[in-house]
């Protein structure tokens, strides 16, 4: 992942819930057995709204890949969007690509599940 302005923070986290195609709930491991649950908005992309068939498909696509799994999360210092969610880049292991770490934000755009903002 590359830095997109501002200081970035990187954490390991477990995705506890996929809320929609571009919003997830994660349990972040802060170290020393300290964990924090928060909601993240996938940075730089926009998925269709859940009230549409495309939105339902985007949520299902995302859930299949990361829900309940460990991910790497990069957040931006003091970068919250209008609903108070932190913006994040999220990487996951994809068995389709020899378990390489892939940026889910980018893969969603490439596979037509979201558009770049």
Give, region by region, the residue ranges found by the protein language model.
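Small beta-barrel nucleic-acid-binding modules, primarily SNase/OB-fold domains
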Residues: 1-117
């Amino acid at each position: 992942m590359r830095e997109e302005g501002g200081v970035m923070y990187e954490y390991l986290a477990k995705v506890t819930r996929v809320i929609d195609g571009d919003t997830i709930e994660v349990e972040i491991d802060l170290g020393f057995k300290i964990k924090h649950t928060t909601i993240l908005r996938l940075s730089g992309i926009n998925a269709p709204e859940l009230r549409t068939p495309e939105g339902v498909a985007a949520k299902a696509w995302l859930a299949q890949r990361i829900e309940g799994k460990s991910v790497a999360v990069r957040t931006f210092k003091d970068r919250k969007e209008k609903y108070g969610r932190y913006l994040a880049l999220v990487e996951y292991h994809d068995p389709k690509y020899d378990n390489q770490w892939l940026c889910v934000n980018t893969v969603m755009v490439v596979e037509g599940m979201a558009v770049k903002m």
